[in-house]
Amino acid sequence: MDRKREPVRALELFCGIGGFAEAACEKADVVAAVDQSEIALSVYRLNRPSTPVKGFNLETVSPAVLADFNADMWWLSPPCQPYTVRGKCRDLEDSRASSLRRILSILPQVRPFSLGLENVEGFAASEARNLLVSVLKSCGYRIREISLCPTRFGVPNRRPRYYLFASLGELGEMDEAKISEYSMRDFLDGRPSPELALPPGIVERFGRGLPTLDPDDRNAYAACFASSYGKALMHSGSYLVHNGGLRRFSPDEILRFHGFPAAFKWPPKLGLRKRWHLAGNSLSVFVLRRALSILPHFK
């Protein structure tokens, strides 16, 4: 009789609202989730009350603290702003890259068996990526880098991202079959809130420049939702034709595009704009669940 494999002990760094935990829930035991944002951690706690949640600054974390988690793998979703045009592409000179640099300085001393990282596509051409790969190779890791988008798996949301997987063991292959043939309506609220509607004056002034979608167009896909959605009008996501005008997508709809479960909850007092921010900052559970199969623990 085959013995059931024990769940991998995973340390979720820059955890946000818990995208990695959702993607890895069947095969991983998250021993701790770490983030600086207390608001993000409040969402994480609400949905995963049994997971230890730690709010501390990774820029100054010690090797002993990370070693004490005794994790088989580390998952990293570090800040993307240093590698985006809006973030001025300052790369490792950006102070928001300091936490990643600190973790990489510790890695040779702790060396988890596996490691995974997700970031914007611009990370692939960054000095941060070069440093990451250099450190991993010096520690003897096997490395796989890949660019993936939910549209590749049949999800109508364009969100291309850079992924890196590294392990001291053998790396596997990813199942690239489509998850499903989704349509736009599969992700929409049954009764959208009236507060999602764009004011008529905004539509009249900017409507032609906004990426708009017809919910009944089976070929339509939403643009990447950024953390600025709901705050910045342009270059932050798509808008939906609705009741003769346009409306924003709700945070719950964005989470459905990401693959979060229907049972996922927001703290009752958390405002709409902050929900948009956290949803836009999160990762694609759909994509990561497939991509994790590259690592030995998730085959």
Annotate the PLM regions:
Residues I17-A28:
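Conserved SAM-binding loop of SAM-dependent methyltransferases across substrates and taxa
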Residues S37-E38:
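Conserved SAM/SAH-binding beta-strand->alpha-helix loop
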Residues S42-D68:
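S-adenosyl-L-methionine
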